[in-house]
Amino acid sequence: MADPHSILKKVFGYDSFRPGQEDIVRRLLAGQDVLAVMPTGAGKSICYQVPALLLPGITIVVSPLVSLMKDQVGALVQAGVAAAFLNNSLTDNQKALMLRRAREGWYKIIYVAPERLEMPGFQRFAQEKLISMVTVDEAHCISQWGQDFRPSYLRIKAFVDSLPNRPVVGAFTATATARVRDDIRSHLELHQPYEVTTGFDRPNLYFETRRALPSQKPKELLDLVLREGDNAGIVYCSTTKQVDETARLLQSRGIRAAAYHAKLDAEVRRKNQDDFLYDRVQIMVATNAFGMGIDKPNVRFVIHYNMPKDLESYYQEAGRAGRDGLPSRCILLYSGTDVRTIRFFIDKEMEADNGLPADVKAEAARKAEERLKYMTFYSTTQKCLRRFMLNYFGEAAPEKCGNCSCCLFAEQNAQEVEQRAAAAKQRAAANSRRLSSRRAAVGGDLSEADEKLLAALYALRKRLAAKQNVPAYMVFSDATLREMVQSKPLSMDEFLNITGVGEKKAARYGMAFLRAIEDMVGSRE
């Protein structure tokens, strides 16, 4: 029987687990429930995907968004894993075909929305087959204290209880205060769970806050975006009107930008999201409707044009940057108007006729006001931003991180901050190197010759992705390409030693990359 390490290497192409991952994998394999709080980019999915391939039956992954399911399943299929998703983006015929194949044993991992668990057809399927594990992704959605509460998550427990044999349950989230963790534990009725918080810190992320009047924000944004060159980024706005105006502003300056919000036609949203994932668009301007579950690893900056409603939302949205571990920037543009806008939405929620009792709505408003208070403190503090954020999530931190605007430039204005941004990126790269010797190879500067090789590998990846009709990062991540440049593998064995190269991907893409590397290396000798 295969062991977790062999699955990790053969399927996903990693030599070793990240901190916290192996313990979670082994607990799930032993049948112990798990509650794991791991920051975006820490590798939550590996924690349930590896045991899913080792357990005898099927793993059901409960996921809140169609985009997350599509992204995760696409990456698994590229790695050679039998995975599928079942949601309303499929036609009735496609759903019927997927369920028939699931009954026939085609799949090891199936992603579904929580609402799907209540549907008779899916319940019959789950009764017939061995469900070995139920994974609850974005588990904070089960808590009224969480920033993304979804009542449908409260019905996951009933589904688990209805199965002939209780599966092991794993609950995963990137952001959860102690109150939210209590809710997850109780609402899912986890059985003596193994609880782990791997730490919220993302050393490769540089955090910055800027106070700017609404009239100043367009210029601030343009300056920030233009300094990023061709880097992929996300700009978050608080209203759909602001999203549309900001996208038009960027487009008017020749920047490849697209908009994403709930008022756009579903087909337009899908196209714009795909354009961003496939690198046809450089910048996505969006409300918080965009991002949860988006697994694009090479987002180099996230700018919040408006202050979010709480630190949970901010940390999750900012965490879309730098998922590949390379230095990235998270910048918040703050004005007092942002607070008034958020209070307007809180009051609107109170007045909504949503069937909730008045006392429940009042309590929800009180919780929202409390979270807003801490978000405002973060936006205006002159102390270390990273420390403030980590302390909010219950984690100790040094007094100064050396990689946020308050630590580096407390006495300087925004123009001076920009002049020293390169130094901040260097510090982030140094922090990333301390995390992992393997990452050391991917974070540093490259020689001119290696830059040409990297450009050739990027171009090759783009062509291969187009043939497969998948986003480029699903072929190989930026970090994997950088390691290829550093290591310059010239044989399949050497290629398989590159982080992120599993056996299926090596078989599919290996010879093309080896030829490209050999052509460039040979031309210099």
Residue ranges of predicted features:
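Short alpha-helical "packing" element that flanks the helix-turn-helix/winged-helix DNA-binding module
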Residues: 21-24, 375, 481
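Helicase motor core with emphasis on the C-terminal RecA-like subdomain
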Residues: 2-11, 15-19, 23-45, 52-55, ...
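Accessory DNA-binding and partner-docking regions appended to nucleic-acid-acting proteins
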Residues: 1-4, 340-341, 346-361, 367-373, ...
